[in-house]
Amino acid sequence: MRRRRLQLRYSSDEEEEDETGTSGVGDSVQSFGIASSIQPETSVSSNSNPNPGERIAISEVEIIDVFGNPQPTPPDSSIPTPYPVYPSESVSGNDYESPISEVLSRMGIKLKREWWVSCLSGLETSIPQFSYLDVAAKAKHCFEQFMFFDMNLCGGGVLPPNVASMNRIELAGPFVLQVDEIVNIGCPLKGRYENANAGLKRCLKLSMTDGVQRVFGMEYRPIKDLQVLAPAGLKIVVSSVQVRHGLLMLVPEIVEVLGGMVEELEEARKRLVVEVNKPPRGKRTRVGVVPSLTTRATLAAWSLNGNDTGNHVHDTGNHVNSSASGNASHTQANQGIPVHVTRTHNSSRAMDEPLASTNVGATVSRVEHMQIDTASAHGERTFSDIHSTSSNIHRAASTAGTGTSCSGACSGARSFANNVGGNSLDQTSNVTSFVEEMHIDTGRVRDTTTHIYGSDSGGVAAEFSNMVVDLEGPSVLSTNTEKPFTYLAELSQKWAVMKDTIHFVQGRIKCFLTGVKKFQFKQQSTYELLCYVDDGSLICEILLHNDVVQKRIGHSSMEVTAALSSSAPTSLNAMMKEKLKRFQLFLADFEGIMVVEMNRSSQYPVAIEMNQGCSLTDARLLLDRIKSSSRTSSSLNPVVVLSP
């Protein structure tokens, strides 16, 4: 008896054959109605149905896709076996045979026995009278549950073995696969996780699994239904796919997106995208060792869950035996990210806590981590930190002494708390977008809440109050206007608090450039140069003013455009290119003082002046500031409070 294979054909040259040779098998499968997007249309030989126009009612037994010859039914048997088991089939421990699994297997879904047992028991508990539903309804509920399960854990393997070693082979399918990761290989690593429309400039690479082996697919022609930022764990169905050197060549005709996602993989993908899209951080670390971007991305994706210990990828050729996290790490490893990653880091712990890793642990432990949060998280943290700071100042001042001498310090602390707390309540949701990280460390304030002894309680209280404001209070209240430089975090905090009352704030920042995000000057009257600047407290985007750029280049943007527009090489063209090259080297080597202005008209802080290096005057001012701070701290008697 000739065996029959059920196939999904999406090729345009085979649709005409299906219109003339479709039998009742396709109609029977479509009657299940599990998902409108994956109703198969099968074709069989013409001798099985001499009248193509007539529908043949075929029972569910006859459409089971089997391998090998079925065992003949005894002639004296009046009742056929509803779901026969054929001797040619090798039933493994993970296979699960039931009418429901047969329905999903015809669509290209093969799942493990453990998943079926768990899913059916859960549905019987959650859905009333689930056991009385027909096979189609039960299969529909199981399919809905499957869409949000991780095939790395529940997949039984629907692909033929050793796909990675195949070449010039067409796999008929259909195969339902889970997409763990999508990257745009038409861009460098920094741009691979940015959304891009389907077109000739985009080439997606998909890391997919059927639960047993990892396969990769390439977007051979633009597929509009696939997106770079699609959720991890997306389910797709492929059929009649060409394999070239182990790579699935994906075209729109053979790919259909079903949907779904896996929550754990999606959270890891989001953390990875945030890490990759962060601005450059420069090359400064404690020991001068800078981890690669792929290493940082891997740690960002899988080092935040302290409960997942020991999950790693054990690569055995084409087969992957791991958990969901391991397969996702394997997915990233094929994009240049290390394979063996153990997730042991807890997000609530300090960032300098050592991370556990099998391959990159030695490197990562030497890295100075710099956490850069989003603007919304910054707003909430700033609000809470300001309140905790003001409350600590109030407690510190209240312990300095009693009587009229302490009342001045306490009232000053209360006014500071009310001022900062009230303004921060209104400004929490309006924190400037370019501020990515701002920490107000309250630990040092709490250290000053010990008892202070001295002969003059009033003088000590006033001196103590000044010290607290100098350490932790914002520079808004500082009376020293002759500072050698300030910090971006401090200046950003000042602008966030006072932008409703003043038009702009300025500050001198000692910093260096870590990269250039955008430089435009053609066909416009001004330069637009957006740089990444790091001053040790914050990394943010700063816009260099047109006058600053024009002063360094020596020509306006229109003059540069006119000199570079000539196709023939001239002396003016060569001179302009040389000046632009010198300006590029100046930006690459810049480390000095910037005068930064924050105002309402600009989205970014504007650098209105920049000077290479640090002057001797600034060094003397900084030295005097350090000496005055040391004299203030030395006038207080250090008291060590030992716990009982």
UniProtKB/Swiss-Prot annotation:
GO terms for biological process: resolution of meiotic recombination intermediates. Residues 1-54 are annotated as: Disordered. It comes from the Eukaryota. InterPro entries: RMI1_C, RMI1_N, RMI1_N_C_sf, RMI1_OB. One of its GO terms (molecular function) is nucleotide binding. Disruption phenotype: sterile due to extensive chromosome breakage in meiosis I. Transmembrane segments: none annotated. Keywords: Meiosis. Residues 28-51 have a biased composition (Polar residues). Belongs to the RMI1 family. Essential component of the RMI complex, a complex that plays an important role in the resolution step of homologous recombination, in a process called Holliday Junction dissolution, to limit DNA crossover formation in cells. Together with TOP3A, is essential for the resolution of meiotic recombination intermediates, a step that prevents entanglement of the parental chromosomes. Component of the RMI complex, containing at least TOP3A and RMI1. The RMI complex interacts with RECQL4A. This is RecQ-mediated genome instability protein 1. The gene is RMI1.
